[in-house]
């Protein structure tokens, strides 16, 4: 739209059925037309939506330029007329029928929120009839989600927040669930559940926690987590084997076995120095018995560990729920028992065919264990679901704790409430994505200061949405949850009966996500190198604002990049309806992540350096996926891991080209 058009529309006032007067908003027209096309089941109709949208605006421009008001019914009449003029008969009929049903619904339900409920339920029924493969439990789940979502829209969130979500300016994640108290991705503690029933107890905790967490659950540092359990089982097995073998050879009556048991119980490592038993070793044959008993015990523990890990991974991967994502991190415990856990785990991953629902997060450090590097590299080349977290990245280093990522690159580490950095027992409380491409489109012919002014408005809106979600969840009490606040969340032991969970979840993070950041840069800059630098500038700016919000509100605001396909598809669909097909911006089915700006081929070191700079500013992390050639060797892949460390890249996924 040119300046003259903007002037006409800026001065036009829409009169609603209730008599309320609001400013003319062309985006609502685009969304109404898009919904009409969507309800007919037509696919790839963005160009058609945009054409009808432009025709409607043209009609209003030509016929209302000298008027001050337009009725909402008149706008709908114009949409209906243009659908007919453009020969979209099915859409015209669907839109006409929709208006008739809405009129009947408004008569039946006086309250606006009730009317919206009916609209939402009708939409589910329509979708279930259209999709003949819908199962009864899936339709029932959709009904439940819709009721929860519409209740949240009607009674919980502010109208301006809902408008921003529904016009594609932002995307509120977990909108279906957060009012019920559901938390997002969480690094559960698990410290209190590693008993002799492993892996059943971990599996049950992880599975039951899914009823309270809408997101990924990570089992962090499993190569440390299992150590106490394995040491306990090793000591039991070593005493059992030693007793049995000494008895078989007739030595048991001549040795104070109780003292030997006491020595074994004092050991906190698996690589026991048998010389501590010298006073009880009567001869070479007895020493040989000790050596055999020790070796057999270690072997039994390895077998137990392998079987248990396989059961755990298979069980987690095969959970039949709507949200079934898990991650397991490991890789840095270089003790004998730690290496045993790492090697057994990698053996199991190598043996299992498909692990789509369980991601392995392998942690790497400079001068790490080369044997493990080679093993994990072989698995990645075979297509296993493994991602890498670099603990030596400048922003991940800490002398006391290891950083933990989720499989989508999201990160929790810093904590505004204390000096200690940590991840385990913390969660993403809520996430809201800002449609950066929309901002870029609107400011493509404006100054950079105007762009940042509008970005500030969106950041303020996003901050307020996140705070409202935090307060809604924080008002739940400990009794609303059965699993996650039972020694699985940081400081949940301080929660008393009946107490609100606010003081515990405030140690989690409120996630400001930037969606379509690369497309935003393309709208604002034509030169590709300048686009890459602009992306860094924008991330730095938003991160600075997030730090300010954290200090002002004593809450942990972080900045990350949107990686989920669903919001990226929804946002681009809105923008296609409004702006049409724009080269390199809306000429695809889904907005892209910023790693799409790099090919990771000709100048891969320079590309990695850019990624390292981006991730240093993304306090909440981002996902980078590098595609590998089919013929890559273990040596070449290890060089990529070393380059990742050298270039300060904190998190990366490597995928084989198909």
List each model region and its residues.
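Predominant activation on well-ordered alpha-helical scaffold segments within soluble catalytic domains
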Residues: 27-34, 50-57, 61, 76, ...
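Conserved catalytic cores of very large enzyme subunits
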Residues: 101-506, 532, 536-658
């Amino acid at each position: 739209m040119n300046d003259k058009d903007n002037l006409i529309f800026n001065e036009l006032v829409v009169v609603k059925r209730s008599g309320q007067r609001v400013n003319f908003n062309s985006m609502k027209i685009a969304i109404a037309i898009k919904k009409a096309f969507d309800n007919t089941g037509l696919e790839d109709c963005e160009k058609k939506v945009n054409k009808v949208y432009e025709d409607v605006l043209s009609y209003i421009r030509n016929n209302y330029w000298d008027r001050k008001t337009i009725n909402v019914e008149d706008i709908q009449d114009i949409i209906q007329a243009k659908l007919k003029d453009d020969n979209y008969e099915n859409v015209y009929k669907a839109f006409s029928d929709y208006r008739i049903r809405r009129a009947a619904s408004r008569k039946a339900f006086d309250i606006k929120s009730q009317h919206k409920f009916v609209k939402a339920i009708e939409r589910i029924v329509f979708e279930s009839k259209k999709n003949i493969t819908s199962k009864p439990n899936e339709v029932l789940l959709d009904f439940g989600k819709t009721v929860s979502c519409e209740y949240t829209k009607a009674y919980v969130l502010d109208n301006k927040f809902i408008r921003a979500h529904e016009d594609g300016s932002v995307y509120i994640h977990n909108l279906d669930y957060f009012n019920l108290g559901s938390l997002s991705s969480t690094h559960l503690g698990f410290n209190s559940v590693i008993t002799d029933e492993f892996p059943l107890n971990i599996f049950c905790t992880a599975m039951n926690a899914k009823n309270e967490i809408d997101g990924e659950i990570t089992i962090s540092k499993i190569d440390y987590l299992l150590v106490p359990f394995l040491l306990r089982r090793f000591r039991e097995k070593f005493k059992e084997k030693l007793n049995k073998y000494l008895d078989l050879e007739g030595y048991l009556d001549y040795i104070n076995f109780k003292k030997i048991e006491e020595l074994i119980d004092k050991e906190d490592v698996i690589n026991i120095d048998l010389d501590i038993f010298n006073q009880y070793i009567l001869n070479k044959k007895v020493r040989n018995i000790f050596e055999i008993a020790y070796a057999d015990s270690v072997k039994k523990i390895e077998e137990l560990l392998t079987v248990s890990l396989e059961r755990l991974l298979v069980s987690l991967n095969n959970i039949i729920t709507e949200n079934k994502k898990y991650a397991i991190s490991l890789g840095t415990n270089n003790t004998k028992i730690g290496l045993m856990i790492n090697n057994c785990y990698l053996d199991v991953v190598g043996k299992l065919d498909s692990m789509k629902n369980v991601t392995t997060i392998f942690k790497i450090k400079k001068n790490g264990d080369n044997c493990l590097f080679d093993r994990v590299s072989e698995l990645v080349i075979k297509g296993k679901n493994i991602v890498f977290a670099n603990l030596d990245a400048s922003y991940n280093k800490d002398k006391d704790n290891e950083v933990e990522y989720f499989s989508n690159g999201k990160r929790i580490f810093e904590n505004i409430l204390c000096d200690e950095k940590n991840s385990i027992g913390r969660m993403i409380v809520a996430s809201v994505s800002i449609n950066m491409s929309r901002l870029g489109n609107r400011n493509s012919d404006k100054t950079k200061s105007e762009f940042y002014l509008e970005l500030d408005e969106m950041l303020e809106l996003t901050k307020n949405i996140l705070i409202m979600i935090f307060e809604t969840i924080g008002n739940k009490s400990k009794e609303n949850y059965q699993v996650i606040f039972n020694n699985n969340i940081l400081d949940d032991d301080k929660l008393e009966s009946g107490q609100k969970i606010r003081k515990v979840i405030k140690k989690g993070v409120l996630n400001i996500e930037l969606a379509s950041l690369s497309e935003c840069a393309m709208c604002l800059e034509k030169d590709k190198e300048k686009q890459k630098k602009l992306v860094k500038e924008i991330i730095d700016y938003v991160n600075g604002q997030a730090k300010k919000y954290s200090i002002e509100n004593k809450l942990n605001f972080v900045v990350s990049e949107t990686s989920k396909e669903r919001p990226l598809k929804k946002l681009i669909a809105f923008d296609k309806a409004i702006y049409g097909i724009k080269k390199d911006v809306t000429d695809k089915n889904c907005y892209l992540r910023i790693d799409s700006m790099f090919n990771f081929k000709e100048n891969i070191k320079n590309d990695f350096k850019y990624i390292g700079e981006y991730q240093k500013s993304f306090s909440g992390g981002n996902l980078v996926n590098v595609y590998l050639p089919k013929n890559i060797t273990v040596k070449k892949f290890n060089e990529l891991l070393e380059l990742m460390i050298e270039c300060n890249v904190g998190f990366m996924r490597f995928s084989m080209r198909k």
